[in-house]
Design a protein with these regions (language model features):
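Secreted/periplasmic carbohydrate-active enzymes, especially glycoside hydrolases
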Residues: 1-108, 112-116, 137, 147, ...
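Active-site beta-loop-alpha junctions enriched in small/polar residues
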Residues: 63, 99, 121-123, 157-159, ...
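Generic structural signal for helix capping and beta-alpha/helix-loop junctions
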Residues: 103, 126, 161-163, 198-200
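Short, acidic/turn-prone active-site loops that include or flank metal/cofactor-
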Residues: 120-125, 215-218
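Active-site-adjacent "subsite" loops/lids of carbohydrate-active enzymes
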Residues: 124-136
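Active-site cleft segment of glycoside hydrolase catalytic domains centered on the general acid/base Glu
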Residues: 127-129, 157-180
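Active-site groove signature of glycoside hydrolases
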Residues: 140-167
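Extracellular glycoside hydrolase catalytic/binding regions
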Residues: 172-218, 222
Length: 223
């Protein structure tokens, strides 16, 4: 079934993270309810991130889903504390590193208007025998989180060339992931995070829609 939303109110980041609620009901009486937001965005090389037609500079953090004494078994209250701290520091975007996070936290991103980067746990080292696993995890990530307006990109991997470098098999695996994302979701771009400087003309670097480079720098004294 399909339906148009007329005179829709946009999900507009921190300024107005407006959400709609939709319920699907089957003939047997079963129902499923979800929330979604209406928004459009683009990424321009000169203007940066544009949300609903206006520039929206991104300032953010990366979040791991764990706590001392709790590990990854964190509570909703802990997630809410994380969100409160992120908002208090003035961030408007978040990278959910480097795996599927709890649905409750994606919901919080929608609710409070954080722009989010979601990704799979394909990290540091490429293993050829794990290709099927990476594809399965990416499919689950996209299908489970498609309705979240906060998510604006799918991350293919993180610092994947640290131990293995760029290989033909590595590139092929990322091409499969990239194609899968585009097939499942034509509305969001793909990206990957690089830890080291790579040739910008390398086909591997140019493979996703967005190239993201991590800069690790030590604090330096200032006058």
């Amino acid at each position: 079934a399909a339906s148009d939303v007329y005179k829709r109110q946009l999900w507009d980041g921190l300024d107005d993270p407006y959400l709609y609620t939709v319920t699907a009901r089957l003939d047997n009486g079963e129902t499923e309810t979800t929330r979604f937001g209406c928004r459009k965005f683009e990424i321009d090389p000169q203007k940066g991130f544009i949300l609903n037609g206006h520039p929206y500079p991104l300032r953010g953090v990366s979040r791991h889903q764990d706590r001392k004494g709790a590990g990854v078994a964190i509570t909703k209250e802990m997630m809410e504390e994380d969100m409160a701290l992120i908002l208090e520091m003035g961030a408007n975007t978040i990278r959910l590193a480097h795996y599927q996070h709890a649905q409750y936290f994606y919901d919080l991103c929608d609710k409070y208007g954080l722009v989010a980067w979601a990704e799979i746990p394909y990290i540091t080292e490429h293993m050829p025998e794990a290709t099927a696993n990476t594809l399965s995890q990416m499919e689950e990530l996209v299908l489970q989180n498609y309705n979240h307006p906060s998510i604006i990109c799918w991350g293919l991997s993180n610092e994947i060339t640290v131990t293995t470098g760029v290989t033909e098999n590595l590139t092929a695996n990322h091409r499969l992931l990239n194609d899968l994302c585009h097939r499942l979701d034509s509305t969001r771009p793909t990206t990957m995070a690089h830890a080291f400087m790579l040739d910008p003309n390398d086909p591997f670097v140019q493979l996703p829609d967005i190239c993201s480079c991590l800069l690790y720098t030590s604090p330096s004294p200032r006058d």
